[in-house]
Amino acid sequence: MSNDLIPRQARHALARVSQAFPVIALTGPRQSGKTTLARSSFPDKPYRTLEDPETRQLAMADPKAFLAQFPDGAVLDEIQRLPELLSYLQGVVDNQRRMGLFVITGSQQFGLLQSITQTLAGRVGLVELLQLSLAEIASRQRINKDQLNTLMFTGAYPALYDPLRAGALQPGDWYRAYVSTYVERDVRQVLGVRDLATFERFVLMCASRSSQLLNLQALAADCGISASSARQWLSVLEASYLVRLLQPWHENFGKRLVKMPKLYFLDTGLLCWLLRVESPTALATHAMRGPIFETWVMTETLKHRLNQGLAADIYFWRDNHGVEIDLLYPHLDQLFPVEIKSGTTFSSDWLKACQRFAHFAGERSGPATVVFGGESSFETQGTRVMSWLGFSSTTG
């Protein structure tokens, strides 16, 4: 691995999966580092990208001959550009019966995961790679207590931490190009959106709702579109790894529960750019700082689990009286509640939601955690109070 590359935690999950399946599917957002991780993890395998028109044409014209070039397997990038190749890949791996033969990557889930799991059932191991985690960023630069706003404002796409562009690449410039190149091109192409202004408004309205309950009817009304269009557009944003819908945990413990999901963006830098936050200093006093911090903690939790190769079993819990647990993850027969507070000074009031949940859930409730924007970590009244600085390495 090049000394310029930030070591990705998911490489261990990737190596483990490659010993158990003939095909490894590495999926995630565009520009999250999938190609770099795949090539650095399997340096001896030939590399081809189906984004290249000539390569794609060769594979389309004669799929069997194309795959026959790689008797020891290959890294096939952007497989979503030619999903028909998966059927031919099935025949190759069935004949070879070797583990870790092909590595395929994909940036969009528009039916891609379904195609992969159906066509290559029992033959493919899945690894999801999101943007850089805090621990990965900290492996290359010192993180101190004053950098939270900068980290949230910058976001976690690897390009923004490239030492070759240090100081030259501004987050705003990068996100402007990212949205123009990928969001507008890819998403609009799939949806067939003709009214760009309305679609842009939809994305902005989604950004203003990050970490909030998703009322699809209200979102559609605010954008002047039908609820069915809003549902379709949102599903494509989710398939593009731009947003994630966090589902409510189903056990009610005798309470009436909210059934709506919560909407989260998967990168706070992109979220800040969409919300027109101009700098880390502006973020410090921004009205959306609390929701942005909650978004950041959720994505860190998700990255930690996915990087270990674990299922993304993260939920929230909220009853119709407003008692809410921001994050809830099951482990064995217990449920572990996490409260998220952006403040820097601890308040005992922050413990109330977890205490009420423990009362409702009884023995089902595991030890609670409160994650906050301060620098110290400690335990009080049976609850772990975790600084944002150490939270990502202890979740899940």
Predicted regions and their residues:
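Accessory nucleic acid-recognition modules appended to NTPase machines
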Residues: 171-335
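Domain-level recognition of nuclease-like catalytic cores that cleave nucleotide substrates
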Residues: 130, 373-396
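Hydrophobic anchor at the beta1->P-loop junction of P-loop NTPases
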Residues: 26
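N-terminal pre-Walker A segment at the start of P-loop NTPase domains
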Residues: 1-15
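Conserved lysine of the Walker
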Residues: 34
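Hydrophobic positions on the alpha1 helix immediately C-terminal to the Walker A/P-loop
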Residues: 37
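Conserved catalytic/switch belt of AAA+ P-loop NTPases
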Residues: 86-110, 118
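Interdomain motor-coupling "hinge/lid" segment immediately C-terminal to the ATP-binding subdomain
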Residues: 2, 107-109, 113-215, 241
